[in-house]
Structure formats: structure tokens, C-alpha cells
């Protein structure tokens, strides 16, 4: 269910789109890291520094696909999923200091927002489970905070405007 904040954000996007037109897609990858807890499954979320893109928002580890992530097939074509997998493992290590084995990453979705969105990421979504002994470490630069949320808790906090 949409709330007033969502409606005003959509109106801004709509106005911006009319002025600017369709934006190019930016290839990206993100990882939903899960762990078991006494209260059930929890998801790792990271809070971005207010001075960087998506500042202040709570996000899953992830980001843009870099040139160094690219995997080229023998026929010269780009292997998009392998490339996204490389980016997912790199971003998780950079943002949360968690080394994720590619064998433990499970690709589950690919999202492309509508053309009206001002900044459009073509995002590959992966899931993995936190392994015993892995600990989250943030750099206090790009990422300033981390927390483990139950899925319904994160949605409720977002709907209440307590996290973005």
C-alpha cells in the first residue's frame, strides 16, 4: 500500500522524467545476506553515508558492475550473470568485509525499474547465508552502520519513515 511519501516521490520522478526523458541503465549487483537467529531469519542491511549516492538509505551490499568484473565468453559476448556474480562478491567484500564464495551465491532475480525512474539500475539480485565465523565489518566511510533486520521489521520501519 502506498503512503503519502511514496506518492510525492512518484510525482517528483514523473516531473523529472518529463524534463529529462529516459535514463540509461547502469548494470549492478546486490546480495541479500541472511542468517538464522532465535527470532527467525534476519537480513543484513547497511546504512550509506549521507554524503554518497543513496545517502542515509539502508541497503543490501551491492553496487555498480565495474570493468574488472566483466566475464567474456569464447564468442566475445558478455556473460552477464557471471559478470554480476563477480560484482556481487566484490561489493560484499568491500562494503561488509564478508568474503562470499561464488558457489554459495544464488541468483534469484533481475530488476529493471521503469523508464520514469531518474537513475536506473539493471540489478541482479543474489542471496546467500552468512557462514559461521563470518563477521560484518564496515569502513565508516561509504557505509556508516549495519544491522540485522527481520524482513517484516525492515518493511514496517520503512513504512513508518524510521528507515529509508
Regions of interest found by a model, annotated:
Residues 1-164:
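N-terminal leader/linker segments that precede catalytic domains of diphosphate-processing enzymes
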Amino acid at each position: 500500500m502506498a503512503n503519502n511519501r511514496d506518492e510525492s516521490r512518484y510525482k517528483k520522478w514523473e516531473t523529472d522524467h518529463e524534463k529529462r526523458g529516459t535514463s540509461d541503465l547502469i548494470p549492478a549487483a546486490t546480495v541479500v545476506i541472511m542468517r538464522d537467529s532465535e527470532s527467525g531469519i534476519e537480513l543484513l542491511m547497511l546504512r550509506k553515508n549521507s554524503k554518497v549516492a543513496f545517502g542515509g538509505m539502508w541497503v543490501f551490499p551491492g553496487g555498480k558492475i565495474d570493468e574488472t568484473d566483466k566475464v567474456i565468453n569464447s564468442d566475445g559476448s558478455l556473460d552477464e550473470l557471471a559478470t554480476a556474480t563477480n560484482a556481487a562478491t566484490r561489493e560484499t567484500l568491500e562494503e561488509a568485509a564478508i568474503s562470499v564464495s561464488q558457489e554459495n551465491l544464488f541468483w534469484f532475480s533481475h530488476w529493471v525499474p521503469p523508464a520514469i525512474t531518474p537513475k536506473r539500475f539493471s540489478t541482479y539480485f543474489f542471496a546467500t547465508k552468512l557462514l559461521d565465523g563470518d563477521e560484518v565489518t564496515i569502513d565508516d566511510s561509504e557505509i556508516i552502520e549495519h544491522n540485522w533486520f527481520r524482513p517484516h521489521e525492515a518493511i514496517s520501519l520503512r513504512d513508518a519513515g524510521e528507515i529509508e
